[in-house]
Amino acid sequence: PPELKAVHPLGKSPVVTEGAATVIEFGAIIDYVLRHHGAGDLAPAANTPEYDTYQQWLHYAEGSAMLPLMLFMYVGRLGEAGAPLHPRIESEISNHLGYVEGVLAGRDYLMGAELSAADIQMSFVGEIVGAFGRYAAYPNIAAWVKRFQDRPAYRAALAKGGPYNMGPKD
């Protein structure tokens, strides 16, 4: 829309502006907000192995995990014309969701016992699994999504921004 083009040449959201800074892309926005306004409790300390893993999750969400899920959605609109692509897309979905499912085995959150910004960045991936009706195949992902959706801050954000299709169904 023209309003967003006035803020950034790509005219896309999300976008955050603050002073001279204009930041696009969820991962970059999360990083910016935490560095400028965070209390230090949503990311591990920099220059640690945990921070490296955390950074991986910030980039993995949109760099790898979302692609097969989005392709599944788009190719589904092609009907029979998209049928030849489904096996490869399904293979990639299984590969990525299997990876996340395994990481979450025995953990409450991606980085361990505590919620981090990595969970926030990956939240849409988890929620879309439910929207696609796949929680039965990925119980650790389903439990993780329920945990973060049950958090008071998540509920407060929904109350402020309004419900959306991927949100809790209670």
Spans of features found by a protein language model:
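Short secondary-structure boundary/hinge segments and terminal tails
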Residues: 1, 33-34, 147, 165-167
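GST-like domain detector, emphasizing the conserved glutathione-binding G-site
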Residues: 1-91, 101
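Phosphate-coordinating loops and pocket residues in cytosolic domains that bind phosphorylated ligands
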Residues: 6, 150, 159-160
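Conserved residues at the C-terminal ends of beta-strands
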Residues: 19, 123, 160
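GST-like fold's C-terminal all-alpha helical module
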Residues: 58-152
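Terminal-tail/helix-coil boundary detector
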Residues: 154-170
